[in-house]
Amino acid sequence: MAEQVDCVVVGAGVVGLAVARALALRGREVLVLEAAHTFGTRTSARNSEVIHAGLYYPQGSLKARLCVQGRALLYAYCAERAIPHQRCGKLVVATADAQRESLRAVQAHALGNGVALQWLEHDEARALEPALECVAALHSPDTGIVDSHALMLGLLADVEQAGGILAVNSAVALMEYAQSAMNIIANDGTHLQATTVVNAAGLAAPALALRTQGLDAVHVPQPRYAKGNYFTLAGRAPFSRLIYPVPEAAGLGVHLTLDLGGQARFGPDVQWVETPDDLAVDPARGQAFYAEVRKYWPGLRDGALEPGYAGIRPKVFDAQGAAITDFVVQGPAAHGVPGLVNLFGIESPGLTSALALGEHVAQIVA
């Protein structure tokens, strides 16, 4: 006999919890199913914990819109709930005159997304960060950092206070739309029937979608796993802001981020791997970090970088093998399965966008 429930959210990362919160605060009955032993153990626990301002994302994209909306919501939420965070700011730096044009392009693009940046010449940037080497920089005052675990605790508390439930060790075996409801079979044989199901399973979202009977596989993108390695600094860094090199074709470059204790870490790089469980950091990869970091911090000492941790970006690709660069929020209007919303490719800025994503999904299923 199936147990009836209004809404099921599969995945208790920061986005799944934000979706569950948005639904619960609207009076919906919510059950969150998490395969792991607790919430937020994968992508949500292995990132830079940066609150992004929204500089780089294509204008009109979900990433651009939800990042800007989510950033405002996140700062307000953290202040209201006393969640540790800091609006420390970020400098995007050009380390050669040839990069000035690229830096100007970043400034213009950010402005198109509604994000104002301050142009700094060498001396102005050095006045903010004396150890920095650059020819020019952009100052993003609205970039910050957040304690992602404390954030998820707050979101979960909101869900539970509104009557929602988190069930851990609850992997989903398959789903099917039948008898005017989404039927969910857990690995332990539990059978649930739900009006609304949100697939917020992160790295596992495409695989879960393929186990959803009645959902045409043409709607499921191909996952690929982009590992990002981080190296931590032995000792204190002489910086109080995040430092990012000017973006190049290969990505955002090896950037310096800080945690709330002031500890510096560098990364992430990009390493394509076959499995999302490949989380060991190869110390040899650190050698490539030194040359990149010294472009903007010549004072980095030999031997100062230590292997930190790694995360996996949930990249997705279309049937032709082209990268899908925007968030995919796929509701019944896209795939035709009533009551089902799939979230694919929720990589950065997923943490920043989480509260806005929750609101967006709640509106789709209203």
Say what each PLM segment does.
Residues 5-32:
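N-terminal Rossmann-like FAD-binding beta1-loop-alpha1 element of flavoenzymes
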Residues 22, 51, 83-86, 191, ...:
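Active-site substrate-recognition segment that forms the wall
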Residues 25-46:
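Glycine-rich FAD pyrophosphate-binding loop
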Residues 45, 323-366:
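C-terminal lid/capping helical subdomain adjacent to the catalytic/cofactor pocket in oxidative enzymes
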Residues 56, 143-145, 248-251, 340-354:
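Glycine-rich phosphate/pyrophosphate-binding beta-alpha loops
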Residues 58, 62-69, 93-102, 139-157, ...:
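Short beta-strand to alpha-helix junction loop
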Residues 138-196, 355:
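Helical element adjacent to the flavin cofactor pocket in flavoenzyme catalytic cores
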